[in-house]
Amino acid sequence: KLACRFPDFIDYVESVCNEFRELYQNIKGTTPYCIKRVAVLNSWGKMRAWGAHMVHHAIYQKQNYSYAGVIEALSGAPFDVSFISFDDIRRDSGLLKNIDVIINAGDGDTAHTGGDVWEDEVVSSATRQFVYEGGGLIGIGEPAGHQYQGHYIQLANVFGIEKETGFTLNYDKYNWEAAGGHFITEDCTKEIDFGEGKKNMYALEGATILVQKEKEVQMAVNEFGKGRSVYISGLPYSFENTRILYRSILWSTH
């Protein structure tokens, strides 16, 4: 009934559908070339594929747009994207052998990043092993964020970053210098837009800071065993941020 009041909208939908019919007719079931296999890891997996960060018909939310851009960027990229849950890893951690890069994005202690699921040694050890043996890990916001056993970022040694929650104020922190240039940021022509970003993030020894603002890390990279990780405080959708994510995936899988 609502759509009938907007005939131009109906006509446009028809034209778009016809475009897709033509595409399907021409590709004849061919799988497009994908350069890497990327898995978005959260509590829902396939249940909320492509919609994990969508709230109320994708209406803009200040708390959400810094993460929704990640899914938007992946949707048009030359990657084989899948969505896996923590329960999937519990059932069969071997599935990670068919993945090149894991992305964990969102605020800490939420279903997006896992919360107390990281207390489960099966999940945490499988993820660490994946990276140590050569996999890539990209964290956006507060990946694996949950206060437990002296850490807030439960994969702190993998990402090379930690969040100051008051428990490490008396720790000396010396790693604040940002690197001059990096493969990931080569396409950037202006200051990187981190959206809301994150406060109180600091780098651990050995990590390479790409961007920091007032001694708060916004982007960093780290090597863990044979693998690599990338940390980004937020990534709202834009052309340049799409390139950042694209190059982050390539760099993390080297």
Positions of the model-derived regions?
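Catalytic beta-strand/loop cores that center a nucleophilic Ser/Cys/Thr
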Residues: 50, 164-228, 233-243, 254
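Short, solvent-exposed loop/turn segments at secondary-structure junctions
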Residues: 45-47, 88-89, 108-110, 143-146, ...
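A short, well-structured beta->alpha microelement
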Residues: 73-93
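A glycine-rich, often tryptophan-bearing local segment used as a flexible ligand/cofactor-contacting loop or short
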Residues: 109, 114-190, 241
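Structural motif
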Residues: 100-107, 138, 229-231
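Short amphipathic alpha-helix with an adjacent loop that forms part of the alpha/beta core around
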Residues: 90-97, 119
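Hydrophobic targeting/anchoring helices
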Residues: 1-69, 167-170, 210-212, 231-234, ...
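Short, well-ordered alpha-helix to beta-strand connector turns
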Residues: 98-100, 206-207
